[in-house]
């Protein structure tokens, strides 16, 4: 075990020190005591020992972690699913089928892949719910000049990718805001989905959420079925779509995000409300400008965890 593995680790959480050595010492002690005393009743303590070993071993198995914020670990690709013409969902196996990702809402993971002899690092937001176990789901959109997204597109089941995390600064607490407004664009929906899963899986969280989601075309709207299902099941959540190039069948808003749409669909400024923005830089800057004009207090520097207007 490396030094970084040992640091911050309780030595008794390691199977050798917390299970095998104590169990062996106990068995030897029982054998010696039984031999010297002739009391066979002492052997009845062995089933209790085996129960303790089982509980400790099961706990150690569940404690195995797949992600660390300070070092890389390799995860195996289980499968991939195409969800749009240039986007796919990649499912990676965690170390055990019992493990659930404990990633704070709105935080991301770092991904490292080898390309042309160099290690390229990118950041993605897992969309796996805390209630799901055994896997990590990433949505990756392929870009014409995207080296890492092209690398992902070439992966096959059984291939491995290096991960590190969680990483991020957003702070979210249940019921910390009465009304949460969100502006998202393209693949910027992934951290939003994390937050939505965090809210709707906690019955006590009564935060109202309004989402304004922009894309180039209807086919570019990622995870639309999931978002529509959430909006149907949870009365506190509303979603509004905007597309730049609509089809003849489109009945929603058209164009780019506007100040009027933000004013119409999202909460107004209040100390009890909050605004999150996640998308391409151009959209983020435009949404920030509109937020200022609508009275929101915008931090002039990089967003920090508790900012009322937070840009991912």
Curated annotation (Swiss-Prot):
Subcellular location: Cell membrane; Endoplasmic reticulum membrane
Gene Ontology cellular-component terms listed: endoplasmic reticulum; endoplasmic reticulum membrane; plasma membrane
Regulation: Inhibited by diphenylene iodonium (DPI).
Keywords: Cell membrane, Endoplasmic reticulum, FAD, Flavoprotein, Membrane, NAD, Oxidoreductase, Transmembrane, Transmembrane helix
FAD-binding FR-type domain: residues covered: 70-173
KW Nucleotide-binding (keyword) present: no
Matching Gene3D superfamilies: Nucleotide-binding domain of ferredoxin-NADP reductase (FNR) module (3.40.50.80), Translation factors (2.40.30.10)
Catalytic activity line of the entry: 2 Fe(III)-[cytochrome b5] + NADH = 2 Fe(II)-[cytochrome b5] + NAD(+) + H(+)
The keyword Transmembrane is annotated on this UniProt entry: yes
Enzyme class, UniProt record, top EC level: oxidoreductase
Cytoplasmic side: 37-39, 201-312
GO biological process: ergosterol biosynthetic process; protein transport
CDD domains the record matches: cyt_b5_reduct_like
Residue ranges that the UniProt entry lists as topological domain Extracellular: 1-15, 61-179
Membrane topology, as annotated: Multi-pass membrane protein
Protein induction: By calorie restriction.
Pfam families named in the record: FAD_binding_6, NAD_binding_1
UniProt GO MF annotations: cytochrome-b5 reductase activity, acting on NAD(P)H
Source organism, top-level taxon: Eukaryota
Residues that, per the record, bind FAD: 153-168, 179-211
Record EC number: 1.6.2.2
Family matches, as InterPro entries: CBR-like, Cbr1-like_FAD-bd_dom, FAD-bd_FR_type, Flavoprot_Pyr_Nucl_cyt_Rdtase, FNR_nucleotide-bd, OxRdtase_FAD/NAD-bd, Riboflavin_synthase-like_b-brl
Function statement: NADH-dependent cytochrome b5 reductase that reduces coenzyme Q6 at the plasma membrane and mediates lifespan extension by calorie restriction by shifting fermentative to respiratory metabolism, probably through modulating the NAD(+)/NADH ratio.
Remarks, miscellaneous: Present with 29000 molecules/cell in log phase SD medium.
Protein family: Belongs to the flavoprotein pyridine nucleotide cytochrome reductase family.
Annotated protein name in UniProt: Plasma membrane-associated coenzyme Q6 reductase PGA3
Organism listed in the record: Saccharomyces cerevisiae (strain ATCC 204508 / S288c) (Baker's yeast)
